[in-house]
Amino acid sequence: HNIVNPIQTNGLLLDRKWCSFFRENGFLVGISLDGPEDCHDMYRKKTGGQGSFADVMRGMEMLKGEGVEFNVLCAVNDYNSRRPLEVYDFFRSTGARFVQFTPVVERTDPSGGLCAGEGAENARLTPWSVLPDTWGRFLCDIFFRWVRNDVGDFFVNIFDAVLAGYVGREPGNCYFAKKCGHALALEYNGDVYSCDHFVFPEYLLGNIAGDNLRDLRESPAQKTFGEAKTKSLPRTCRQCRYLNICNGECPKNRITPSGEPGRNVNYLCRGYKFFFSRTERYFTFMAGDLSAGRNVLAVKDVKF
């Protein structure tokens, strides 16, 4: 088997020794970075309350100095979502060539604890969650900057995933895939959960101290979890023209009632539809070029 070693870090504890280890062993390092300094420091603070931006950038420079392959993972929240082009241009300036934008959608129960996606009673959306309309505009603004200037040079995970849907391929992420359950979550104590978005008691599969990891991945409980993504889609999703692109997105975010019991709509649906509708012609053009074996860079000069 070919073993690939990616690691996700906030970058605070990176030093030369770690960076050398990553380089020597071919690690891909994901750095959590939420944009320019004020955007990043809004929510990513150290234990003393200070912002962590300077430390993260120091760690990134060490990775670059050691020749370690890295990419950026950006949590899009209520604050940085209002400044899409500043965020995008900042990432371009860092020397990164790949960025993953992850929308922050979190709910808490009356006690303040985080809730699972569907079925949580009396849950409230956190104030730092991104708004659906803002998420859609965030994606659009960045897309039109990217499609005119950076196609082929800079890679945005969600754009790649959408294009995959247009050409009938599996996306490179789980949340646009038809089924869930391919990536288990392993906790520090050996507990294994169905997904890192569902680290809750009802999604505990077992523990690697006594269970075989392959058996847990192929267990009936995990199979049911994975298939539920499609089986629980409401009618409005099943009839949507963009179903083959987003497949209802992540079940964690399906918290908006659809009128059908147990079949919620994705909280971000309105934002996604806004983005899909305004970029459809561009993705259709790129999909045509890909299917014909042509280079997609021609889309930079297309005018619709």
Language model segments and positions:
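Canonical radical SAM enzyme core domain
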Residues: 1-24, 29, 33-39, 47-58, ...
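Generic recognition of stable, solvent-exposed alpha-helical segments in well-folded globular domains
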Residues: 17, 55-58, 82, 86, ...
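Radical SAM enzyme [4Fe-4S]-AdoMet core and its adjacent flexible, acidic
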Residues: 42-54, 61, 65-175, 179, ...
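Flexible mid-to-C-terminal extensions adjoining Fe-S/redox cofactors in radical SAM and related proteins
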Residues: 199-304
